[in-house]
């Protein structure tokens, strides 16, 4: 029997952001709908490896391969995908485009934030590593395989040695959690990164005039992003009282798949 490809999703509640994961069931079910006809499996992490005070939910994605190995789950390739994404049912099989490499999608959102994050982490932890914003990927969609297990072991060792600095940077500067360090660490450890098309991680959609907000948007109230990609990442959305992340994830899921219990 051939090894299966796996979709790995972190779904952890956080005391610092209560209710953040409430709409994640829409993401998880969309991925199950996409994966099951292909014979792929979806694994959802709901138990912490470390307490929140030591490691937040974002960093737990780096344990995907370790957890699969420790539980004797064989696999071919693994997509580590954020739980604030929804996949279109007609999405092509991106695993076939990986060439066996570490794959991600270039971050295509707020360049000021990316530049600031690169600078802060560079100054504090990665002085000798050069990272440009046009090389910078979003960590919400990453394809890996067994040969990347050693890389993630190095990531964990680096976190164990520098976790206090990571946590203080996030607390003081608000420049992200795992994403910028992972970009730097792929450079530091010479990981061959292949950038896939942004259709597989359509990010910060409100900046692209793809989300309609009443009394603000000039364009029609439709799901315009459905024509702009295959995987919709609901990040960087303003906390609108009526059209927050949960609203957009629920609306998108029901449009594509119907109610959750269907």
Outline where the language-model segments fall:
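Short, solvent-exposed loop/turn segments at secondary-structure junctions
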Residues: 12-15, 49-51, 85-86, 109-111, ...
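Extracellular/periplasmic catalytic domains that process cell-envelope and extracellular macromolecules
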Residues: 1, 97-98, 134-136, 218, ...
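N-terminal anchoring/stem segment of glycosyltransferases
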Residues: 1-76, 257-262
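A recurrent flexible, glycine/aromatic-enriched loop bordering the glycosyltransferase active site
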Residues: 129-144
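A glycosyltransferase accessory/donor-loop signature
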Residues: 150-262
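Short, flexible, basic/aromatic active-site loop/helix in glycosyltransferases
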Residues: 119-133, 150
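GT-A fold catalytic core of metal-dependent nucleotide-sugar glycosyltransferases
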Residues: 57-118, 143-144, 148
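Residues that flank catalytic or metal-binding motifs in active/ligand-binding sites
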Residues: 3, 61, 81, 137-138, ...
């Amino acid at each position: 029997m051939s090894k299966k490809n796996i979709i790995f999703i972190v779904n952890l509640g956080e005391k610092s952001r209560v209710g953040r994961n409430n709409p994640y069931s829409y993401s998880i079910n969309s991925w199950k709908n996409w994966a099951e006809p292909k014979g792929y499996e979806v694994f959802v992490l709901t138990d912490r490896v470390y307490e929140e005070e030591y490691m937040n939910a974002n960093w737990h994605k780096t344990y995907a391969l370790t957890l699969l190995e420790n539980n004797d789950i064989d696999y071919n390739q693994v997509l580590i995908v954020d739980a604030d994404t929804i996949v279109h049912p007609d999405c092509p099989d991106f695993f076939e485009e990986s060439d066996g490499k570490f794959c991600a999608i270039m971050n295509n959102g707020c360049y000021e934030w990316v530049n600031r994050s690169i600078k802060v982490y560079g100054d504090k932890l990665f002085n000798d590593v050069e990272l440009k914003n046009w090389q910078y990927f979003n960590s919400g969609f990453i394809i890996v395989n067994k040969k990347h297990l050693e890389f993630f072991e190095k990531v964990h060792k680096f976190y164990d040695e520098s976790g206090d600095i990571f946590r203080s940077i996030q607390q003081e500067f608000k420049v992200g959690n795992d994403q910028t360090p992972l970009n730097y660490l792929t450079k530091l450890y010479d990981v061959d990164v292949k950038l896939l098309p942004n259709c597989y991680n359509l990010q910060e959609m409100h900046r692209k005039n793809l989300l309609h907000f009443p009394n603000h948007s000039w364009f029609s109230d439709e799901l315009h992003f459905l024509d702009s990609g295959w995987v919709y990442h609901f990040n960087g959305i303003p906390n609108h009282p009526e059209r927050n992340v949960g609203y957009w994830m629920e609306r998108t899921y029901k449009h594509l798949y119907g109610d959750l219990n269907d």
